[in-house]
């Protein structure tokens, strides 16, 4: 099997992912196909009938070169992408690409592609494929012929025409047609693998591909039968011509009555064979028509099923679309209701806010009224600054009442004698908190007044005041202002402090010396004067 000493051997390495190796033993014939009587059985998965029963033959020639022969396969044998003629040996060399069959639809390469290589046996032993058990060379199945054909062949002797060959061809076609018809009309029995029918696994092949392969195979058989019929017609004509020539020259041929009967039987056998071939051809054509009709029916039913499936999918899609639109409408209505509720709530909030603002404005106005009417000093007409409450419960600014008491010791409002002064923190805090809620202008004005009062207090502390009771004594650069008693309604003219600088008087009482009435300077002898 391998070269002696070197350990080299010839083998076929399969192309593709499954790199299996087929060993080519030296001096032996190697057959490949999908049948049982071959060396290596090939089982196509994409197209079950792509490989014939005995597809090709590998053997060595006289120069120990390997050759490949196409055994008239249906889809042919290809050497380096060139198809080989049937029954003709082609020499192979190392690296030659052998392709069995044609590429299936939607594929670029065939399922079975091999490269002839010469490698060590130990190197490829792990990938070797074992041949089928039995003889390496395929043996033909012996068939029993009819008695007439047997007698004719036995009595004829040596002849250029072999009747058993045509009988074998016709029986093969008949068996193939029967097996195809049986496999097409009857389901396969579980656990049984028929030998005459296609012994391949078709679980992974779609029904459409199986039907296509069957129709292709049946068409090829019809063509083979037609070729055999033509061949039989030609041979019958040749036989008749030879027989006619022998009958026309009886002396040369020296035919006796027995020889004439033999020739007649031979012609009759050929005619019977021809009629059988014609019947088988008609039967094959009929079966082919049935297969085509079944294919059309299956395609029509498949198309109808696909249309129904598409209609169901369309109806389901429309139903889902309707449900989706209904759900969207419900969501839209819900969103509109939510938006309306939010708008209503926003409007209510806005109205409440406006009410609160109005109430706040009303409260501020009321606070201003309270500040102007109740928390205002009657002497300076300003809000209390460091409020002081007298024993008579009347309140004044601390600075204002101190300035008043320098002239009189009685309340400017009720004329009750002043006995005590009490600082009122409650009024100060209340006024401060109320002023904080007023406008910034009011806040700044009050802060300026407080600062001014502090400066005035500091100025008085630095410049003391003298009280002179003698009305005839005068000091230079001073004014004498009468402090006559008058009604409480004219408090603005009861107490005046006159200085040379009129700005000081205006800041304190809000008026200048020009506004004083002449009656304010008239005084009795008991009146006292303030000298600044």
Swiss-Prot record:
Reaction(s) catalysed (UniProt annotation) = S-ubiquitinyl-[E2 ubiquitin-conjugating enzyme]-L-cysteine + [acceptor protein]-L-lysine = [E2 ubiquitin-conjugating enzyme]-L-cysteine + N(6)-ubiquitinyl-[acceptor protein]-L-lysine
What is the source species? Answer: Xenopus laevis
Protein's UniProt keywords contain Ion transport: no
- FHA domain mapped to chain residues: 30-84
Assembly state and interactors? Answer: Homodimer. Forms a E2-E3 ubiquitin ligase complex composed of the rnf8 homodimer and a E2 heterodimer of ube2n and ube2v2.
Alphabetically ordered keywords of this record:
Chromatin regulator, DNA damage, DNA repair, Metal-binding, Nucleus, Transferase, Ubl conjugation pathway, Zinc, Zinc-finger
Which compartment or compartments is the protein found in? Nucleus
Q: What is known of its domains?
A: The FHA domain specifically recognizes and binds ATM-phosphorylated MDC1.
Question: Which family does the UniProt entry place this protein in?
Answer: Belongs to the RNF8 family.
**Pathway terms, separated by semicolons:** Protein modification; protein ubiquitination
**Name of encoding gene:** rnf8-B
Identify the InterPro entries for this entry: FHA_dom (IPR000253), RNF8 (IPR017335), SMAD_FHA_dom_sf (IPR008984), Znf_RING (IPR001841), Znf_RING/FYVE/PHD (IPR013083), Znf_RING_CS (IPR017907)
Q: Where are the annotated RING-type zinc-finger regions? A: 377-415
- State the Gene Ontology BP annotations: DNA damage response; DNA repair-dependent chromatin remodeling; double-strand break repair; double-strand break repair via nonhomologous end joining; epigenetic regulation of gene expression; isotype switching; negative regulation of transcription elongation by RNA polymerase II; positive regulation of DNA repair
Q: Which PANTHER family match?
A: E3 UBIQUITIN-PROTEIN LIGASE RNF8
| Record's protein name | E3 ubiquitin-protein ligase rnf8-B
According to the UniProt entry, which residue ranges have a biased composition of type Basic and acidic residues? 169-178
Q: Which GO terms describe its cellular component?
A: chromosome, telomeric region; cytosol; nucleus; site of double-strand break; ubiquitin ligase complex
> Pfam families annotated for this entry?
FHA, zf-C3HC4_3
Described by its record, this protein's role is as follows: E3 ubiquitin-protein ligase that plays a key role in DNA damage signaling via 2 distinct roles: by mediating the 'Lys-63'-linked ubiquitination of histones H2A and H2AX and promoting the recruitment of DNA repair proteins at double-strand breaks (DSBs) sites, and by catalyzing 'Lys-48'-linked ubiquitination to remove target proteins from DNA damage sites.
